[in-house]
């Protein structure tokens, strides 16, 4: 059995759906929301690499590496902000984060 484009798109659609459900169904934990955003970015990367490989073009794969770099930086900065917020407030609930003054 050959793994084709439709298999990659199916896996990507499942990951994207899990990420969207994670954001909409969990409104209390910021870490789970951050992980759901990472799942969505991973699904987009799988799509880009699958189409790039299917079309024999390297540009999509290079762009996917840039997206992974941005996602890693976003996760690191987001977790650092959450650690500082937890030290100051003692909680990382979404309701507490919404009360921040800007």
Curated annotation (Swiss-Prot):
Location in or out of the cell: Cell inner membrane
Family of the protein in this entry: Belongs to the complex I subunit 4L family.
Transmembrane segments annotated in the record for this chain: 5-25, 31-51, 65-85
MF terms in GO: NADH:ubiquinone reductase (non-electrogenic) activity; quinone binding
Keywords: Cell inner membrane, Cell membrane, Membrane, NAD, Quinone, Translocase, Transmembrane, Transmembrane helix, Transport, Ubiquinone
Major site of localization recorded for this protein: membrane
NCBIfam families in the record: PRK05715.1-2, PRK05715.1-3, PRK05715.1-5
GO biological process terms on file: ATP synthesis coupled electron transport
Membrane topology: Multi-pass membrane protein
EC number: 7.1.1.-
Quaternary assembly: NDH-1 is composed of 14 different subunits. Subunits NuoA, H, J, K, L, M, N constitute the membrane sector of the complex.
Matching Pfam families: Oxidored_q2
GO cellular component, one term: plasma membrane
UniProt enzyme class: translocase
Name of the coding gene: nuoK
Alphabetized HAMAP family for the sequence: NDH1_NuoK (MF_01456)
Protein name, as recorded: NADH-quinone oxidoreductase subunit K
Catalytic reactions of this protein: a quinone + NADH + 5 H(+)(in) = a quinol + NAD(+) + 4 H(+)(out)
Described function: NDH-1 shuttles electrons from NADH, via FMN and iron-sulfur (Fe-S) centers, to quinones in the respiratory chain. The immediate electron acceptor for the enzyme in this species is believed to be ubiquinone. Couples the redox reaction to proton translocation (for every two electrons transferred, four hydrogen ions are translocated across the cytoplasmic membrane), and thus conserves the redox energy in a proton gradient.
């Amino acid at each position: 059995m050959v793994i084709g484009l439709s298999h990659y798109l199916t896996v990507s659609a499942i990951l994207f759906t899990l990420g969207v459900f994670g954001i909409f169904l969990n409104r209390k934990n910021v870490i789970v929301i951050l992980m759901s955003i990472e799942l969505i970015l991973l699904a987009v990367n799988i799509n880009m690499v699958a189409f790039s490989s299917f079309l024999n073009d390297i540009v999509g794969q290079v762009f996917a590496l840039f997206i992974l770099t941005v996602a890693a930086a976003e996760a690191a900065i987001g977790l650092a902000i959450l650690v500082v917020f937890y030290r100051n407030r003692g909680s990382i609930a979404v309701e507490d984060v919404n009360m921040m003054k800007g």
